[in-house]
Amino acid sequence: MTGAPQVIALSCGEPAGIGPEIAVAAWDQLRADCPFVWIGDPRHLPSSHPWQPVSAPAEALQVSADALPVWPLEFAGNTTKGEADPQNASGVIQSIKTGVELVTSGKAAALCTAPIHKKALIDGAGFAYPGHTEFLAALGGVDHVVMMLASAALRVVPATIHIPLSAVPEVLTPDHLRRVITLTDRGLRDQFGLTAPRIAVTGLNPHAGEGGAMGQEEGDWIEALIREMQTEGYRLTGPHPADTLFHAAARARYDAAIAMYHDQALIPIKTLDFDKGVNVTLGLPFIRTSPDHGTAFDIAGKGLANPSSLIEALRLAQTMAKTRQP
């Protein structure tokens, strides 16, 4: 991303969760080499840490060494750690919108989002989206995105996400999987700088169906789709048995894996690097990362929150911004 300041916009997320405290902890570690501007109500920040208002993300380059750069918003509700106040819903939503506006206008290089509490947004503002990602897709004007979980050890995309396991075979159609593969390939090229990304695709069933003995989807259409897309230039392999795809030697043979359902994708990455996994949304017209955890109401304000995932999300956003192809 040339010509734009390499400053990340960080939306505040749910103020009653751990978002504000891990933002400050991330600033403590990143202030010198990964500047970001926190978008939220400064009253929600830990009182002992310095912050300074900014009116443009580029100002963070001068401010960050001494204070957390803040794009100040005023929230309506009170904040008690661990207890979401629906009156703050409009402020949380505005923080996300402001982050998107800063990135799409070229004033910030990428967007990182702290965790939200969906019920509070529904109760307080009639939030009409299944989640954070769908809201960002609407703001970005796109119909389809994919979720990638990334760490130093693994990049993995679940082809289906928050649906019952019993519904996966119905949702997982050839058109759906083709779209997931296409968006993953494009994201690896455009946002990760890979010129010819290697993608490994798992099977749906145990042992990738074992020739039809343990399921039909692989033989009926998954293998045929992979072969068809190979002829179109995609560097795909599979369908692989998922239980042998995530050990170290196997991971060396691909740049990203596509798994068929939520747990098939998330168990390996959380086993390999639980604290440093990053959620990346591919398919948006801007870079978006987020920490791979929720609001953690149970530990908010107790000095127990681990900022590692947010730190990695900010670092990855910066790296992606430097390598992104327009």
UniProtKB/Swiss-Prot annotation:
Residues annotated for substrate binding in this entry: 132-133, 270, 279, 288
The keyword Nucleus appears for this protein: no
Disulphide connectivity of cysteines: none
Cofactor detail note: Binds 1 divalent metal cation per subunit. Can use ions such as Zn(2+), Mg(2+) or Co(2+).
Subunit structure: Homodimer.
Origin: domain of life: Bacteria
Function: Catalyzes the NAD(P)-dependent oxidation of 4-(phosphooxy)-L-threonine (HTP) into 2-amino-3-oxo-4-(phosphooxy)butyric acid which spontaneously decarboxylates to form 3-amino-2-oxopropyl phosphate (AHAP).
Protein name: 4-hydroxythreonine-4-phosphate dehydrogenase
Keyword Magnesium: yes
InterPro entries, alphabetized: PdxA (IPR037510), PdxA_fam (IPR005255)
Gene: pdxA
PANTHER family named among the record's database cross-references: 4-HYDROXYTHREONINE-4-PHOSPHATE DEHYDROGENASE (PTHR30004), D-THREONATE 4-PHOSPHATE DEHYDROGENASE (PTHR30004:SF6)
Catalytic activity field: 4-(phosphooxy)-L-threonine + NAD(+) = 3-amino-2-oxopropyl phosphate + CO2 + NADH
